[in-house]
Amino acid sequence: MRDVFEVGAQDGLARIGELDVPRAGVTVETPTLMPVVNPNLITVEPSRFVDEFGAELLITNSYIINSDDDLRERALDEGLHEMLGFDGAIMTDSGSFQLAEYGEIDTDTEAILRFQHDIGSDIGTPVDIPTPPDADREQAAAELETTQQRLELAETVDVGDMLVNAPVQGATQPDLREQAGAHAYGTALDLFPVGAVVPLMNQYRYDDMTEAVLAAKRGLGRDAPVHLFGAGHPMMFALAAALGCDLFDSAAYAIYARDDRYLTVSGTEHLDDLHYFPCDCPVCAEHSPQAVRGMAAGDRERLLAEHNLHVSFGEIRRVKQAIKSGTLMELVAARAHAHPSTLDGYRALLDHSDQLEASDPASKDAFFYTGAGSARRPEVHRHHQRLDRLDVDGDDVLLTEGDSNHRYDESWNVLPPFGPYPSALATTYPLTAETPARMDRAGYEAAAEGVCRLAEANPDTAFTLAHDDWPESALEAVPQRVSLYNAVRGE
């Protein structure tokens, strides 16, 4: 067990956690967002982060500080906390982003870790190699080997009680990501950033991002705190949490504000296109878009950055509540349908229902069917997998969406998308699900999969499925030996 991270409530891979940061003397509740602070260009004073926005942790770049003589001297003299005016925990990056952007940097793992320690960082980062997406396998494997060597070197650097990140690389090669996760987890390092996914997010390739993160998670242990490097847009926090990520960082709040862009949970709006602010944060409650457009550039940038922080931390709180109440997948589905790319990410997530199911609580408060994706959720997968454990009494069994019939030895209920279940389970989760009266094709097809599973597990039992006018695509999936009766048409 890693002593610095404790997992609490879970919903699939998502969890509420407590990250102990000993050097800062604080415990951070996750999931959480780290505002990125560029010490050369501060848009919102970090001294405001804790009380006004709820930030417990920020991230800044030690390479930028080390490369500027004035900043370097200030940081060494004052320490990061005093220099930035921030009382929470501080994570520092090593310059790997600059390495990805410019191809080289003037530092190494040992030197930058010692510098991070000397300026008072609470969580440091070695210099890893951020292999770009779609790099060929040879490049990805070679650069991963270099990263792993640097992680092993980082273990040997004496940094006191400063925590150290162990970045997980591997480009878009799932097996390399999984291998990288296992190697990183096997070190004595503390946190596990999934790196080099910013290009995927910038290109709206949320499906590929999902595959990369889930592969890394397969290599990491349950007690590994995971940081999704560069995840700063609130539209994808719910998805990222559902992937099992605990820490996100946002430079977007400031970068977007500089370009008059306004973040929402469903995308990005340009200030010029807004007649009303669709938000009740202090900035939006006290100003109109017209008033903000008329301000001086610096004031406009600051207010937009403040809004962007408010909406981002508001979404983090919403994600936490959804995890606590067991409704995160409903939130993910709602966010996914706001943009085709997040929908791709959601569908990629559902392709791994077995991985989600392994850590999903067996019982929650409610299951809401909100669309075709709900038919592929872990709860449906789990129900189908467990059908062969249930005893069927009798040789002639009715599976029905309606009332039981005493002409059969036994009657089972049928509820799309789950399919058949004994009436004794009717009041248990997830069979208490709220489903629409007009079920979609995917829900019926999933129910048919459940019928197949039950029939396969009981080859000597005769089954009759009394359905409420299911579509042909679902009926075609039912085994031929199962008799069909359309209860709506009476045939």
Curated annotation (Swiss-Prot):
| Enzyme's top EC category | transferase
Q: Which GO terms describe its cellular component?
A: cytoplasm
Catalytic reaction equation(s): guanosine(15) in tRNA + 7-cyano-7-deazaguanine = 7-cyano-7-carbaguanosine(15) in tRNA + guanine
Q: Which GO terms describe its biological process?
A: tRNA wobble guanine modification
Binding-site residues for substrate, renumbered to this chain: 128, 196
The organism's superkingdom is given as Archaea
Listed GO MF terms:
pentosyltransferase activity; zinc ion binding
One Pfam family cited in the UniProt record for this chain: TGT
Q: Which protein are we looking at?
A: tRNA-guanine(15) transglycosylase
Its taxonomic placement starts with: Archaea, Methanobacteriati, Methanobacteriota, Stenosarchaea group, Halobacteria
Q: Which gene does this sequence derive from?
A: tgtA
